[in-house]
């Protein structure tokens, strides 16, 4: 089934020799590229070699079975054959997953954009709780976070926020968070005890590199203005806030979180590049209906993906029909279990398509 992987093993061994060659190491750019290729192949090669060892051991055990003349040894061989057959089946499934086409964005940093939706002040409070949840999850993963821009709303609420998350595999873990998140609870201001429903929209964008997106200066309109705080009052006496409009697409990015205009412009450009990259990917995906079906949900940000029900203390992800009854822990960043299940579901759907 995996015979063509022998050539992958040969390539891996060849790479091992190359990355240890002093002449190759001297060319840092080429060496880094080869090291990445080596690291990408290593999990597949290790699993394949383990799989081949198990196949060889199984064949040897089957040849021995019935020839030892020792009943105790025969029973041991039967047990070992059963264990090896189970392991080989597991190896095959793991190899299939390792051979699935990789998302080229998986290892990238991300921008998480959270916007309050329907529900007024409650929606703003919920958007703030989602921001905190992703910050705490990132801390647990030893990733770094940086607020690129934030617009506050009401008391402690957020109208809109853009946060950058830097860390290995950030996009691979957070990409399933895109969509509409719904909260059901009794607001503190609700005297009758009636449950209100509010929403917040989350968009997760991979950080675009210069090679991904080329932006012509003539396509940009850059406006500067004084940063405003909660309620619209000016919080800065200089024109430090920056608004960048990409004229061909109409995309607008505003950044006023820093006191420096230069820093705000730099942050705004990073976000703009990622939004343009996301737009380009979206256009490509319009021609890939089958690929869209293989994703968890549709990837549409208008899709309701998850409900946070406070009275029942539960979180339900509607894409995989999974419910967790540890709401506060979840909001404190313990979302790994849900992400693992979403990843497994996504892989299973892609395997179905391959088969």
Curated annotation (Swiss-Prot):
PANTHER family: LD18447P
One Pfam family of this chain: PCRF
Ranges of compositional bias, category Basic and acidic residues: 283-293
Protein name as it appears in the record: Peptide chain release factor 1
PTM section of the record: Methylated by PrmC. Methylation increases the termination efficiency of RF1.
Gene source species: Finegoldia magna (strain ATCC 29328 / DSM 20472 / WAL 2508)
Family: Belongs to the prokaryotic/mitochondrial release factor family.
Subcellular location: Cytoplasm
SMART domains: PCRF (SM00937)
In-chain residues carrying the UniProt-annotated modification N5-methylglutamine: 233
Region (Disordered): 283-304
Function: Peptide chain release factor 1 directs the termination of translation in response to the peptide chain termination codons UAG and UAA.
CC annotations in GO: cytoplasm
Taxonomic superkingdom: Bacteria
Molecular function per GO: translation release factor activity, codon specific
Coiled coil (UniProt feature): none
UniProt KW keywords: Cytoplasm, Methylation, Protein biosynthesis
């Amino acid at each position: 089934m995996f015979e063509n992987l022998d050539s992958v093993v040969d390539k891996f061994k060849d790479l091992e020799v190359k990355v240890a060659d002093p002449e190759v190491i001297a060319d840092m750019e080429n060496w880094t590229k080869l090291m990445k290729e080596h690291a990408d192949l290593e999990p597949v090669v290790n699993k394949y070699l383990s799989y081949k060892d198990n196949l060889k051991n199984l064949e040897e055990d089957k040849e021995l079975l019935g020839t030892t003349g020792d009943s105790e040894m025969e029973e041991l061989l039967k047990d070992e054959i059963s264990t090896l057959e189970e392991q080989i089946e597991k190896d095959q499934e793991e190899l299939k997953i390792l051979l699935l086409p990789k998302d080229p964005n998986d290892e990238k940093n991300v921008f998480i954009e959270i916007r309050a939706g329907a529900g007024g002040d409650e929606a703003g409070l919920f958007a703030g709780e989602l921001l905190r949840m992703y910050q705490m999850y990132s801390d647990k993963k030893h990733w770094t976070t940086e607020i690129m821009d934030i617009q506050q709303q009401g008391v402690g609420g957020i109208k809109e926020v853009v946060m950058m998350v830097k860390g290995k595999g950030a996009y691979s873990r957070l990409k399933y968070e895109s969509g509409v998140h719904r909260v059901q609870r009794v607001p503190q201001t609700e005297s009758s005890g009636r449950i209100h429903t509010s929403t917040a929209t989350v968009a997760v964008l991979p950080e675009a590199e210069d090679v991904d997106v080329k932006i012509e200066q003539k396509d940009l309109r850059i406006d500067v203005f004084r940063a405003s705080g909660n309620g619209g009052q000016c919080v800065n006496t200089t024109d430090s806030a920056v608004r960048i409009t990409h004229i061909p697409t109409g995309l607008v990015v505003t950044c006023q979180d820093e006191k420096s205009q230069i820093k705000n412009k730099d942050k705004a450009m990073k976000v703009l590049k990622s939004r343009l990259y996301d737009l380009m990917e979206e256009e490509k995906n319009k021609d890939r209906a089958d690929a869209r079906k293989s994703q968890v949900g549709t990837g549409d940000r208008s899709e309701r993906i998850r409900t946070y029900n406070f009275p029942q203390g539960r979180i339900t992800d509607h894409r995989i029909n999974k419910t967790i009854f540890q709401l506060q822990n979840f909001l404190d960043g313990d979302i790994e279990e849900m992400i693992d299940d979403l990843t497994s579901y996504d892989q299973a759907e892609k395997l179905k398509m391959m088969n």
